[in-house]
C-alpha cells in the first residue's frame, strides 16, 4: 500500500504542476497520500504557501479539478480502480515550524 501511496503522491504532484491551469491554485506541495485498503478512495494531503484564504481557494480548486487528477492517475498507475480523491490541508509542517519557533524562543 505504501508503494501505491508514494507513486500516487508523485503522479498527483506532477499533474498539479503541469496539467492544472486554475489561477486559484497557489504554490502546492503534495505531502502524502493515504489510500483506503480497497483502493476506492484516497486522501491527498497538501501544504499550501500563503494565508488561510489562499489555502481555502487552493483546496476548492483542487477539489473541482479532481477529475483531471484522477485521469492522470488512471494513465500512470496500473490499478483496478482509480480512487476518488479528497484533498486535505496538511498542518504538520505548520505545527513543526511553531514548535521550532517556541524552542528557539525558550530561554531555558
Listing of model-derived features with the role each one plays in the protein:
Residues 1-42, 47-108:
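Charge-rich, low-complexity N-terminal segments
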Amino acid at each position: 500500500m505504501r508503494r501505491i501511496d508514494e507513486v500516487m503522491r508523485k503522479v498527483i504532484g506532477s499533474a498539479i504542476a503541469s496539467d492544472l491551469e486554475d489561477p486559484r491554485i497557489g504554490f502546492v506541495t503534495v505531502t502524502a497520500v493515504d489510500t483506503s485498503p480497497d483502493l476506492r478512495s484516497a486522501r491527498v494531503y497538501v501544504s499550501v504557501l500563503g494565508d488561510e484564504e489562499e489555502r481555502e481557494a487552493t483546496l476548492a480548486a483542487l477539489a473541482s479539478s479532481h477529475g483531471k487528477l484522477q485521469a492522470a492517475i488512471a494513465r500512470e498507475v496500473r490499478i483496478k480502480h482509480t480512487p476518488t480523491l479528497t484533498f486535505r490541508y496538511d498542518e504538520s509542517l505548520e505545527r513543526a515550524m511553531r514548535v521550532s519557533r517556541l524552542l528557539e524562543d525558550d530561554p531555558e
